[in-house]
């Protein structure tokens, strides 16, 4: 009875070895995007995968330091302060002839400012209020362009205050960094002179 045998090419070749496959050709520039996750090495798992990601000391220090703008000298805009600034801006523009409003509208604004609330159509009138204000209570005081002019002036003033505050803080920080740099340079120079060998040594 005859039997057929198959001879292996190499004696040390593994019996369960998979046949070699050709590597797939990837277009240029896509080799990194199509690559799979990195496999652990044979010696052991990689240290980068086992250790958690921690920020550097410099960034950790910056995150713990309080921001110089947290306690800014600029007070927050409360509704009362905003109303006061708005009335002052209206009076200033009226004096400069940039806000043409009637005297009755200006008196109405001052009356509403002293009363503490705007005189609306549904709000109760004070007993000492003039009759013309009660009659023309629903009439608008300013047009849209006038309101836009007032808001632009207030925003510009607030922007100038914030810019001055930012520049002062930035100047202080730059001065501190310069002083630290000068001190570090001086210490390095002193160490070099101290470590330099003398003639007697």
From Swiss-Prot:
MF terms (GO), sorted A to Z: transcription coregulator activity
Modification Phosphoserine occurs at: 39, 41, 67, 123, 129
PTM comment text: Polyubiquitinated via 'Lys-63'-linked ubiquitin by Hyd, promoting interaction with rel.
Motif (Nuclear localization signal): 20-25
Reported phenotype of the disruption mutant: Homozygous embryonic lethal; early to mid embryonic stages. Embryos display a range of somatic body wall muscle defects. Embryos show morphological defects in the heart, such as abnormal spacing between rows of aortic cells and abnormal patterning of the aortic outflow tract.
GO CC term, one of those recorded: polytene chromosome
Tissue expression per record: Ubiquitous.
Keywords, sorted A to Z: Developmental protein, Immunity, Innate immunity, Nucleus, Phosphoprotein, Ubl conjugation
Annotated compartments: Nucleus
Ribonucleoprotein recorded as keyword: no
S-S pairs: none
Compositional bias annotation for Low complexity: 112-122
GO process annotations (BP): defense response to Gram-negative bacterium; heart development; innate immune response; larval somatic muscle development; positive regulation of innate immune response; positive regulation of peptidoglycan recognition protein signaling pathway; positive regulation of transcription by RNA polymerase II; regulation of innate immune response
Biased composition (Polar residues): 44-57, 65-75
UniProt region (Disordered), positions on chain: 1-133
Family: Belongs to the akirin family.
Note: 'Akiraka ni suru' means 'making things clear' in Japanese. The name is given based on the presence of the clear nuclear localization signal.
Role of this protein: Molecular adapter that acts as a bridge between a variety of multiprotein complexes, and which is required for embryonic development and for normal innate immune response. Acts as a regulator of embryonic myogenesis by bridging Twist (twi) with the SWI/SNF-like Brahma complex, promoting expression of twi-regulated genes during myogenesis. Effector of immune deficiency pathway (Imd) by acting either downstream of, or at the level of, the NF-kappa-B factor Relish (Rel).
Subunit structure: Interacts with dmap1. Interacts with bap60 and rel; interaction is immune stimulation-dependent; activates selected rel target gene promoters. Interacts with bap55; interaction is immune stimulation-dependent. Interacts with twi.
Protein name, entry field: Akirin
Lineage of origin: Eukaryota, Metazoa, Ecdysozoa, Arthropoda, Hexapoda
């Amino acid at each position: 009875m005859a039997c057929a045998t198959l001879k292996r090419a190499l004696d040390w070749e593994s019996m369960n070895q998979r046949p070699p496959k050709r590597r797939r050709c990837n277009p240029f520039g896509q080799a990194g995007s199509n690559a799979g996750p990195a496999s652990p090495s044979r010696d052991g798992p990689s240290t980068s995968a086992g250790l958690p990601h921690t920020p550097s000391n410099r960034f950790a220090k910056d995150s713990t330091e309080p921001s110089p703008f947290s306690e800014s000298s600029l007070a927050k805009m409360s509704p009362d302060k905003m109303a006061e600034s708005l009335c002052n801006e209206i009076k200033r523009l009226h004096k400069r002839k940039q806000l043409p409003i009637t005297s009755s509208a200006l008196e109405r604004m001052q009356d509403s400012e002293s009363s503490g609330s705007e005189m609306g159509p549904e709000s109760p009138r004070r007993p000492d209020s003039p009759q013309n204000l009660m009659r023309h209570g629903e009439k608008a005081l300013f047009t849209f362009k006038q309101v836009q002019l007032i808001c632009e002036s207030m925003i510009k003033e607030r922007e100038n205050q914030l810019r001055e505050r930012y520049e002062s803080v930035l100047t202080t920080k730059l001065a501190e960094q310069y002083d630290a740099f000068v001190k570090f340079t001086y210490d390095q120079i002193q160490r070099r002179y101290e470590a330099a060998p003398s003639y007697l040594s």
